């Protein structure tokens, strides 16, 4: 599920980026353009927004499973996972702000 969410996020993000304008005066109108004029643009935008939440739910379940089964005893693997979790959170924050 985690991989499926990640692939969905990447694909919908690419489709949204094709129609998005980052200029400060036209950013809002480009989002309105995506929702109104692009075929299934409203669906792509909603899948991208809700897919991010589902991705983090799956990620937290994965961490909880690791804690339940004692995977934290494998120090190197656990530390790499923590670094990846923090990088994912930072990336999501930057994506949300931008």
Curated annotation (Swiss-Prot):
Heme b b562 binds at residue 48. GO terms for cellular component: mitochondrial inner membrane. GO terms for biological process: mitochondrial electron transport, ubiquinol to cytochrome c. The keyword Cytoplasm does not apply. It holds the Pfam family Cytochrome_B. It is a multi-pass membrane protein. It comes from the Eukaryota. Keywords: Electron transport, Heme, Iron, Membrane, Metal-binding, Mitochondrion, Mitochondrion inner membrane, Respiratory chain, Transmembrane, Transmembrane helix, Transport, Ubiquinone. The chain crosses the membrane at residues 1-18, 42-63, 78-98. Component of the ubiquinol-cytochrome c reductase complex (complex III or cytochrome b-c1 complex) that is part of the mitochondrial respiratory chain. The b-c1 complex mediates electron transfer from ubiquinol to cytochrome c. Contributes to the generation of a proton gradient across the mitochondrial membrane that is then used for ATP synthesis. The cytochrome bc1 complex contains 3 respiratory subunits (MT-CYB, CYC1 and UQCRFS1), 2 core proteins (UQCRC1 and UQCRC2) and probably 6 low-molecular weight proteins. Heme 1 (or BL or b562) is low-potential and absorbs at about 562 nm, and heme 2 (or BH or b566) is high-potential and absorbs at about 566 nm. Belongs to the cytochrome b family. This is Cytochrome b. The gene is mt-cyb.
